[in-house]
């Protein structure tokens, strides 16, 4: 197996001898090539699978050494640096997993990479299912293996995944067959024992030193199970798939499975026992095994064309993954803005200032580990928030405001705080797992966007947050969609908590309870506190006030206001 990484520049001969099609890389110089696609490719000329993995695994290392000959760990402005797998291995040194000197073979994280390769393949399949034909996917096969037979147009990986899925879903079937077929086989056949074995006579009674069991004819159920588990063991040894055939049957060695493939004996043997199976499960297993041997024999004989499931612009697939995780299809029409731009992720959740709902606006980012989000991306994200606010206000002006999200309070002329964020995939090389989202704030956050200082409730005062999320979790969740609704709720809650924390870092907030009717109090103070106060609801008995952290006199100014009954300094929750 060969493993390459997207967006990394390799020496061109390495790419060429791997059998990768020219469609999947670009030559920047005469002897260099950069991979521009992600996914799976089978190269018939080398009879091996090639996976191109996302650039998200690459981190910066220095290529300069200190006086003792060790690499300088931290890349700096004065030393040359390169992208490396886990920030440790140069990609051109670990691409060939058949090389016994490959340092990845001794790294415990290799199994995670191999598992991730299969998730990656399935994620592209899933994207294809959800979005139909798309120009970003290069796919020579259009049907997905589902256990049908030789007429299934499927890649070698499709067939292998179907075998692994069958193993996972039919454990009880194999145990049941083993018990049924074993019952009665060890009972003594006394007729055969008496006629075939010479007894020892002692005290006039015969004693038999050995016995004859009941006849056991060839059991085809067990034969196909032995072949199935032997193929799984072959896949484990040859392609490093994580599968442990835990059976009591003697298995066919992997070298003999390879010999069956090379000689064409696998399909011949399966054809000879085809009509011995009647249950749906064993018929399906026969079809899967036949598809496996037929494909493997074609490859061994050099009759297999190259096959690929590769995607350009994997960031589009990642965006779809995040939208499955946190998005809401109910608001897809709002995502498409009048200026032609499309918001990545849009959903509603509890407002930061009230029990009502507010739009959460997200943008997913797919970068290498050390690359920062800056420039145009930040500007566009602030623009998305402004557009959503305006679209919602336009809806209210056109129709009855009842039921619409309450962005603007007519009386204070203040605007609710708009949650706005980036969410970026990352891989922690020291904790690689598929089960934890590990959502955390980015190290480098973004300065608030505003027209006036000290006005958190002004329309143009916007806070933008950045979060990292475990890419492996996003990948596996996208493929499996296990516990989708609960995972979505938990993750949205974590995003909201992180945004609230960020807003609290910028502003001090107060709840002010007037001693006169709220409406009258607002009218009296509107000019003095425009953009600094906001009524959370038409029937609220208090008013939110907010000030920059640098404004140290706001508590006293509020206490000195006329008609104030109580002032509470609080943080948003």
Give the role of each language-model region.
Residues 1-265, 281-299, 303, 456-457, ...:
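Terminal, charged accessory segments of proteins
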Residues 43-50, 347-361:
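Active-site beta-strand-loop-beta-strand hairpin of nuclease catalytic cores
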Residues 274-279, 302-321:
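A short, highly charged nucleic-acid-interacting micro-segment common to nuclease
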Residues 320, 324, 379-386:
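Feature representing long, continuous alpha-helical segments
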Residues 337-341, 353-356, 376-379, 411-417, ...:
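A structural signal for short secondary-structure junctions
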Residues 343, 374, 388-438:
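Nucleic-acid nuclease catalytic cores
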């Amino acid at each position: 197996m060969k493993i390459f990484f997207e967006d990394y520049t390799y020496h061109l001969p390495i790419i060429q001898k791997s059998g990768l099609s020219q469609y999947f890389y670009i030559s920047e110089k005469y002897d260099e090539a950069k991979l521009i696609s992600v996914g799976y490719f089978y190269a018939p000329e080398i009879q091996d699978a090639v996976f191109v993995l996302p650039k998200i695994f690459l981190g910066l290392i220095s290529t300069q050494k200190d006086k003792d000959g060790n690499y300088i760990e931290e890349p700096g402005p004065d030393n040359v640096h390169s992208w490396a797998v886990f920030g440790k291995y140069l990609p051109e040194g670990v691409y060939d997993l058949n090389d016994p000197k490959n340092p990845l073979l001794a790294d415990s994280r290799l199994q995670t990479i191999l598992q991730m390769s299969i998730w990656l393949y399935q994620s592209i399949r899933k994207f294809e299912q959800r979005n139909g034909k798309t120009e970003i996917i290069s796919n020579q096969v259009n049907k997905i293996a589902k256990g049908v037979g030789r007429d299934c147009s499927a890649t070698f990986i499709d067939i292998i995944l179907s075998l692994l899925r069958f193993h996972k879903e039919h454990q009880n079937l194999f145990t049941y067959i083993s018990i049924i077929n074993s019952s009665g086989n060890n009972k003594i056949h006394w007729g055969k024992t008496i006629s075939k074995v010479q007894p020892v006579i002692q005290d006039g009674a015969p004693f038999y030193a050995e016995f004859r069991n009941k006849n056991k004819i060839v059991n085809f159920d067990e034969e196909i199970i032995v072949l199935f588990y032997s193929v799984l063991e072959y896949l484990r040894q040859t392609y490093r798939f994580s599968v442990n055939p835990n059976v009591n049957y003697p298995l066919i060695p992997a070298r003999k499975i390879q010999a069956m493939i090379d000689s064409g004996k696998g399909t011949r043997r399966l054809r000879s026992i085809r009509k011995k199976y009647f249950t749906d499960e064993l018929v399906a297993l026969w079809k899967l095994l036949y598809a496996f041997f037929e494909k493997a024999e074609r490859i061994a004989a050099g009759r297999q064309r190259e096959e690929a499931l590769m995607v350009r612009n994997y960031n589009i697939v990642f965006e779809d993954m995040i939208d499955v995780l946190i998005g809401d299809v109910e608001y897809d029409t709002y995502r498409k803005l009048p200026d032609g731009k499309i918001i990545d992720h849009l959903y509603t959740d509890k407002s930061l200032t009230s029990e009502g709902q507010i739009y959460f606006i997200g943008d997913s980012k797919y970068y290498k580990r050390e690359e920062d989000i800056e420039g145009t991306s930040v500007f566009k994200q602030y623009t998305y928030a402004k557009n959503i606010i305006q679209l919602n206000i336009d809806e209210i002006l056109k129709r009855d405001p009842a039921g619409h999200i309450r962005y603007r309070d007519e009386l204070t002329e203040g605007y609710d705080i708009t949650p706005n964020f980036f969410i970026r995939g990352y891989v922690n090389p020291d904790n690689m797992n598929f089960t934890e989202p590990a959502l955390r704030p980015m190290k480098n956050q973004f300065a608030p966007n505003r027209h006036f200082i000290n006005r958190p409730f002004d329309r143009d005062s916007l806070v933008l947050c950045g979060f990292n999320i475990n890419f492996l979790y996003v990948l596996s969740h996208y493929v499996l969609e296990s516990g989708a609704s609960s995972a979505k709720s938990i993750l949205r809650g974590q995003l909201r908590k992180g945004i609230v924390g960020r807003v609290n870092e910028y502003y001090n907030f107060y709840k002010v309870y007037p001693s006169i009717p709220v409406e009258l109090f607002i009218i009296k103070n509107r000019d003095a506190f425009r953009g600094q106060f906001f009524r959370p609801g038409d029937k609220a008995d208090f008013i939110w006030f907010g000030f920059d952290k640098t404004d140290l006199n706001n508590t006293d100014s509020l206490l000195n206001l006329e008609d104030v009954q109580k002032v509470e300094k609080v943080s948003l929750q």
